[in-house]
């Protein structure tokens, strides 16, 4: 999943064809610092064929929230979720996946409604390093400080690959209407009503972070979705606004 890296091509193409999908491949953390899983026990690594591809957040003992583009067209037989680990490739516990559900309105091209729920094949046992996170009921306000975590690239070019240990970065929320305005580079067509943005100088999520949590006041406020490059000026990271899709999450978690 290299969405963040294909965004440049897509943006250039879209300038001529009026169609964007700026997506962030696997999201990543740039400009952050190491984080202990004990401080983010809801953080998980989504694995395909025994390799990290995306992040996710624990909603309940058998439900994980992630981005739709992280699981689309993937067989559950190839998927596992690593929980309770500081490292995406070791520690904690690997749980097989029983099923997943992508939002019915998910749009592969524009990445609208980029959210999915994963049902684990076996239930989690909660501990100091494995816990669920509650859902935000209201969207974070503009300028609010939020934390974003994951094992994604530390550099835009991916020279160092995925981070070996969990990373976290503090960003500031940019309200959806402002993010879609002429102040930034995306435009109204590409920042949907169910999206929210966040940024800070030289800080961002990057490839490998997609599907991971944006946390505000200890609640899940967003899901890392897409962006143009990593840490690019005038191109904030774009996230699914959890408060907007909260009803869908609750309903789907009870039926998947």
Predicted segments, located by residue:
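Conserved catalytic-core segment of clan PA serine endopeptidases
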Residues: 30-31, 80-126, 131, 138, ...
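Chymotrypsin/trypsin-fold serine protease catalytic domain
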Residues: 87, 115, 121, 127-200, ...
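A conserved glycine-rich beta-strand in the N-terminal activation segment of trypsin-fold
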Residues: 41-61, 110-111
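N-terminal activation segment of mature serine protease catalytic domains
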Residues: 25-49
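C-terminal subregion of chymotrypsin/trypsin-like serine protease catalytic domains
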Residues: 2-8, 59-69, 80, 162, ...
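Conserved H-D interstitial segment of serine endopeptidase catalytic domains
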Residues: 22-27, 46-47, 64-67, 72-108, ...
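N-terminal signal peptide
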Residues: 10-27
